[in-house]
């Protein structure tokens, strides 16, 4: 992996940044969610998502590449055997960053980065719910129109009866 060039370095040197990201990714995969600073969470997100994408393929070469980046065999085994199948139907967006309150000691902006393990809603299911919702809305609109027509007609009839009474 080449030296990171984009943005500020975490920890000062490139090697320290690599170790920080490696340890953060290992903790994220182990616990499912971690609290860290905004900068570290934003740097960790693409790093972790690339590792998960490699784990989804499941090849031996990808396993060795991930082991080179996260040198913890138990966590890599968990990533490939347990987590990767959960993300099989998800094309990306495996992590979520939630902003938290600033840290008490130094007022650093904090975030929680977590794995998104919820099932994705298929497009067919979302289409079905949208169609059902639109049918329901159309029925409600028709009933409202019928009610407004009745209300509009009622005063017209009253005025006609009043006019007839005035003529007599």
Swiss-Prot record:
Keywords: Ribonucleoprotein, Ribosomal protein. Residues 124-135 have a biased composition (Low complexity). Residues 124-168 are annotated as: Disordered. InterPro entries: Ribosomal_bL17, Ribosomal_bL17_CS, Ribosomal_bL17_sf. GO terms for biological process: translation. Part of the 50S ribosomal subunit. Contacts protein L32. Belongs to the bacterial ribosomal protein bL17 family. This is Large ribosomal subunit protein bL17.
